[in-house]
Amino acid sequence: MAYKIDRKTYAQTYGPTAGDRVRLADTELFIEVEKDLTTYGDEVKFGGGKVIRDGMGQSQVRRADGAVDTVITNALIVDWWGIIKADVGIKDGMIFEIGKAGNPDIQDNVDIVIGASTEVIAGEGHILTAGSIDTHIHFICPQQIETALASGITTMLGGGTGPATGTNATTCTPGSFHISRMLQSAEAFPMNLGFYGKGNSTNESNLIDQVEAGACGLKLHEDWGTTPSTINSCLNIADKFDVQVCIHTDTLNEAGFVEDTINAIAGRTIHTFHTEGAGGGHAPDIIKICGEKNVLPSSTNPTRPYTRNTLEEHLDMLMVCHHLDSKIPEDIAFAESRIRRETIAAEDILHDIGAFSVIASDSQAMGRVGEVITRTFQTAHKMKVQRGPLMQDSDRNDNYRVKRYISKVTINPAIAHGIDKHVGSIEKGKIADLVLWKPSFFAVKPELVVKGGSIVWSQMGDANASIPTPGPVHGRPMFASFGQSLIKSSFTFLSKNSIDQNIPNKLSLQKKCIAVENTRNINKSHLKLNSKLPNILVDPQTYEVFSDGELLTCEPLDEVPMAQRYFLL
């Protein structure tokens, strides 16, 4: 006779199931479990007197015969493709299966075999997401990497050489010498890394040299001169070598206006950084470029979301980042031309309707590397409060909105940069870069980060305590952050050409190097849940933004969630 259990008790024991709802941190965002792949009455759970014991939930199957290395039990997966409850099996550092774990000798419909070689991570009552991807990194200091990892980022793409003046302003690792040194430096960090070369050169040989040296993309930045001719040269090489081009356009409109940049791009695929313009770009109307099908538009997090402090903090940030002088009126005018409340307010809404597709940091160069995920969901909260449920959602849940926003920091940046075969979502066959969250800390502080199948970061108490939980509890690096485990758990992304030229061996790289691919045959329609192509017009006098004839405007927030109640120091 079946034993009946009430929903509350079930959720407390095994985590929420289909039809249950979960609040995300202290936001007004609520998700509802769409499907449960575990089997009622046959759930697996570890612990004294629990299921995963020899002859019960643990089978006699050897690892060589199919038992997984790790199982995350009863997790609530939040990904672009769904919000479901499932067990997740990991083997050889990869996602082996998503479904029902257990012992096939005594349980039906087992997808993930637990054996004596299987470790268990308890996912009950936790949310599981893919490790996030930040594609706008200024590699100014190595300490950024630990900060990013602690926030749930597992892949960082960008450029730089350290705290050089050029790196402080631009995400470029210029030339083969610097690219080689940064690739060698990447060996030390428990993070997937990739580096952009400098794309600003009309001599295409300079660009080829950098791609052949290992650059996984090229970056055009106005501080190096983003003219129509450099745009054309850079895209020519990108098309030839299958790497992505990222662009920070000409704020001062010296070499042309946004229409000239669009003409120079000529329908070729390109990733536009801080597409609203406060981070840089044709003033005041770079934002209209998000209506182009070949443009993959992203934001950086200093303008996410629009609050009462957003405008005030930007001027000083901008002056420092771009090596401007407050004693020179023209420098001040340059900075002020980029900061417009009207376009920042419109940016919130363009994200909410899926017209802006990616959010990244702009680390230490106006953006905060540890706040990408937090600010993404602060924006989602703001739009829920100000605009109500999306058409695809209901009064019961915000599932579509949450999936739209999680896509901006996971699968979409992966697609944009040709690494989505490997990372960016929780799917069978991808690298097991996974983040486990308590719902009350979702998008703020991960409970645990898995990197390449091993635990790389976790909330951890006093190391001298008798159990793991006594305070002070804070995020700390775990074993996969050290030694050869680090080397095996993290990866470096390079151009295919550089791998073909044996660059990893020439540089004595030990991390597995993976080629980026399929960056040139994509467009905005390939980006998940964020592919809208609005017709954008910007009033040159008032800076008001219109999308398909509708004025896009919203008020700044006075108070955001996921903020001071989580960060006391």
Curated annotation (Swiss-Prot):
GO terms for cellular component: cytoplasm. InterPro entries: Amidohydro-rel, Metal-dep_hydrolase_composite, Metal_Hydrolase, Urease_alpha_N_dom, Urease_alpha_subunit, Urease_AS, Urease_asu, Urease_asu_c. The modification N6-carboxylysine is found at residue 219. It is found in: Cytoplasm. Its cofactor is Ni cation. Binds 2 nickel ions per subunit. It is an enzyme of class 3 (hydrolase). Carboxylation allows a single lysine to coordinate two nickel ions. Residues 131-569 form the Urease domain. GO terms for biological process: urea catabolic process. CDD domains: Urease_alpha (cd00375). Ni(2+) 1 binds at residues 136, 138, 219, 362. The keyword Hydrolase applies. It catalyses: urea + 2 H2O + H(+) = hydrogencarbonate + 2 NH4(+). Substrate binds at residue 221. The active site is at 322 (proton donor). HAMAP family: Urease_alpha. Heterotrimer of UreA (gamma), UreB (beta) and UreC (alpha) subunits. Three heterotrimers associate to form the active enzyme. Belongs to the metallo-dependent hydrolases superfamily. Urease alpha subunit family. This is Urease subunit alpha. The gene is ureC.
